[in-house]
């Protein structure tokens, strides 16, 4: 249990963020991970996390002009914003040690699938990102102390919300990055 839970919101003016008290919340969860080397060349890994985080005492009262308090919002039982219920990573690596006199010393292929969701963006739980995942890969070509890497992030160009906020009675969503491709050159001294 968390007492004096605090969350961040945009100020009513829309200028800047403020931290507000959100009463109490309860969070529990579990996680597991596994890594296996199937051969000298091939290794696999997986991890999973589950979190259940809800408000247990979060009521917003409003005072009328006569000084009477009325319940403006009751968030008890609602999921705490920005906490993914599930996280998942599945990946693998295949490393080839090349023969002497080859151009490369080693060639390594890596791929992983990262996923998260459902993520609620508001205390009302009226805006959320469903469970989603991105596929990423990398191919490394190693020569002595040098390495050339070809890589892709969000290879399948999954459309998802990376962030959401509300200000001045409007909602704004930041989309996740689209598919990205690149080349890295590294040299160790």
Q: What is each of the regions a protein language model found here?
A:
Residues 9-12, 22-24, 44, 82, ...:
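Generic structural "secondary-structure junction" signal
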Residues 3-21, 26, 33:
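Membrane-topology and secretion signals of cell-surface/extracellular proteins
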Residues 5-8, 23, 63, 138, ...:
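Residue-level detector of intrinsically disordered/flexible regions characterized by low predicted structural confidence
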Residues 20-122, 186:
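Gram-negative outer-membrane beta-barrel transporters
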Residues 2, 15-17, 75, 155-156, ...:
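Residue-level signal for pocket-adjacent positions within structured domains
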Residues 1, 11, 50, 152-156:
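A short beta-strand motif that forms part of the nucleic acid-binding face
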Residues 78-189:
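Conserved C-terminal beta-signal and adjacent last beta-strands/turns
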Residues 5-14, 51, 56-63, 119-126, ...:
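Outer-membrane beta-barrel translocator domains and adjoining extracellular loop/strand segments
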